[in-house]
Design a protein with these regions (language model features):
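Beta/alpha (TIM)-barrel catalytic core signal, keyed to glycine-rich beta->alpha loops juxtaposed to Asp/Glu
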Residues: 1-173, 183-185
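Substrate/cofactor-recognition hotspot
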Residues: 176
């Protein structure tokens, strides 16, 4: 990558699913621009990387910031997904047991959304945007209405106190495993 940058063929580079050790090693060889890892209210394991990212001025690109759509709060224990075509059919957060296990999170997220005149998805994204200036969520969607909804999350203000309150709540709310991750260690 350093050779490509030196040749002017690329201007920035990043890595995905990286640990602190890998970030430090890669950054020493050729300064990183960004690290892309799974991150959401339900999967916060990579928060331990934030100090090194801040120190090294590396951006954090959060993929699956809505836990594969679960944090939209649009699903219940009766939701079904076609096993042969819809990957959510194998994700623990979308199983009937997972939805029941995550009920307190869903209820709590809906309350905050109502207080802010927002959707649960917008609160999830606004929380991320308010946490750190180097954190950029990249939610995916195939729906223009959802894209507009996600973009509007940027206009929702969460104070430092509100972010801290959300973080504290997330530490104590029981949650299921999420696809591609594991239970957040308390």
């Amino acid at each position: 990558m350093k050779e490509l940058i030196d040749q002017g063929k690329i201007t920035h580079w990043g890595i995905s699913e990286a640990t602190e050790e890998i970030i430090r090693r890669a950054h020493k060889v050729c300064p990183l621009t960004a690290v892309q890892n799974r991150y959401s209210m339900m999967y916060r394991n990579y928060e331990s990387l934030f100090p090194v990212l801040k120190e090294s001025q590396i951006g954090f690109v959060a993929f699956s910031p809505l836990a594969n759509g679960f944090l939209t709060c649009r699903y219940d224990e009766y939701s079904t997904f076609e096993k042969s075509t819809d990957y959510r059919s194998i994700m623990p957060q979308f199983s009937s047991a997972g939805i029941v296990e995550n009920q307190k999170l869903i209820e709590w997220l809906k309350i905050i959304a109502a207080e802010k005149n927002a959707t649960p998805a917008q609160i999830s994204l606004a929380w991320m945007l308010a946490k750190n200036p180097f954190l950029v969520p990249i939610p995916g969607t195939r729906n223009l209405k959802r894209l507009t909804e996600n973009i509007q999350a940027e206009s929702i203000h969460l104070s430092v106190e509100e972010v801290t309150e959300i973080d504290d709540m997330l530490e104590h709310i029981p949650m299921s495993q999420v696809f591609g991750g594991s239970i957040v260690k308390k």
